[in-house]
């Protein structure tokens, strides 16, 4: 878990910047941070309980699955003899599909936060695949911002058809890459709740705010995704598509929807450090979105000399508008300073484009590429506020 050390270093830095004085009182830097993270005065204290900002630590366990599917359609020249013995050159359709589908697996992680700020990292447990997730998020009553980096390694299964069934040169082949393919994504999610007075979006997920009574709010959301799929250029499947071993996408989406907090039970604390606090909450969030910026690029590599593969061409295209969505469900229970949270979320995107690349000194025919990525996660969080 190589990301653990940067995270611990960050926590240590925050601790250094927010020291207590000799009498155990908060220092100037700590008081400044508290002021920045102070809740809005617009919050209704009869609807939302806001405890004083404190350090939190949590361990997480994930049940998750990631999958990626890509198809590429193009044509290649092929030769055959006519009944009269004449050599005929014709265009033969080729269909290639690649599937990087991970098995249902588990992951473990840690979260460290202060007030509305939180840093987290997780890594999968066992299995042939390798997954790392690192995220930073800020969640308050009216705002939420999450920045997440995701990396996934797993062998790629592929299927190729050359020509049409019944043709003399028809081929139908399956295979798997010798080296794992890689998926990487950088995601930025931002949400705004219009009902910032009586609704706390983060109440079911973090335990930094507590909803006293049921409430909902219309939401505005935005999503930025930078995604990458790549395989080793030495793989045979890369040569089938003129050396295309890397595809990337950049997408920006905007949308709106509704989020609702159902509070079956709440009891206010009666002593310091939230002693006596009891809270049970369920959150449902759904936001349809429109992806208005959708850029796709494909990169070709060629073995120029001595087994060293070098980028020889790159093609960038802008895609069409498409519909996306954000869906999330969370359940949280708090007992004094301890909290248990169960949540489920999805992260998906799709792309398509037609690329024409120069490969091996020849200009390739147009390669139509379509890809889709889907990752769902169910997370159990056990946290404590200090």
Tell what function each PLM region has.
Residues 114-134:
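Transmembrane beta-strand segments that form the barrel wall of outer-membrane beta-barrel proteins
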């Amino acid at each position: 878990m190589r990301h653990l050390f940067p995270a611990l270093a960050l926590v240590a830095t925050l601790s250094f910047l927010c020291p207590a004085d000799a009498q155990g009182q908060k220092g100037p830097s700590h008081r400044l941070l508290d002021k920045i993270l102070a809740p809005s005065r617009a919050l209704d204290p009869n609807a939302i309980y806001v405890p004083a900002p404190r350090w939190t630590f949590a361990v997480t366990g994930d049940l998750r699955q990631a999958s990626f599917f890509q198809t590429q359609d193009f044509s290649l020249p092929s030769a055959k003899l006519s009944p009269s013995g004449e050599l005929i050159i014709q265009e033969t359709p080729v269909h290639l599909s690649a599937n990087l589908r991970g098995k249902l697996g588990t992951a473990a992680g840690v979260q460290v936060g202060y007030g509305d700020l939180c840093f987290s990292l997780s890594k999968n447990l066992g299995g042939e695949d390798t997954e790392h997730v690192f995220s930073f998020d800020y969640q308050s009553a009216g705002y939420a911002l999450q920045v997440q980096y995701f990396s996934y390694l797993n062998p790629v299964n592929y299927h190729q058809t050359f020509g049409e069934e019944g043709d003399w040169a028809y081929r139908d082949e399956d295979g798997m890459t010798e080296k794992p393919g890689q998926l990487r994504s950088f995601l930025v999610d931002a949400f705004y709740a219009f009902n910032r007075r009586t609704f706390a979006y983060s109440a079911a997920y973090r335990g930094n705010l507590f909803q006293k009574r049921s409430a909902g709010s219309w939401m505005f959301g935005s999503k930025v995704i930078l995604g990458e799929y790549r395989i080793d250029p030495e793989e045979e499947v890369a040569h089938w598509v003129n050396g295309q071993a890397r595809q990337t996408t950049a997408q920006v989406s905007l949308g709106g929807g509704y989020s609702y907090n159902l509070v079956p039970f709440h009891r206010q604390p009666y002593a310091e450090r939230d002693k006596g606090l009891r809270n049970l909450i369920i959150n449902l969030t759904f936001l349809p979105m429109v992806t208005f910026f959708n850029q796709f690029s494909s990169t070709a590599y060629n073995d120029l000399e001595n087994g060293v593969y070098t980028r020889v061409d790159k093609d960038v295209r802008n895609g069409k508008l498409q519909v996306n969505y954000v869906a999330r469900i969370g359940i949280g229970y708090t007992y004094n300073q301890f909290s248990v949270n169960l949540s489920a979320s999805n992260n998906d995107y799709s792309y398509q484009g037609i690329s024409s690349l120069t490969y091996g000194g020849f200009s390739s025919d147009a390669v139509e590429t379509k890809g889709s990525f889907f990752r769902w996660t169910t997370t159990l969080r056990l946290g404590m506020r200090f």
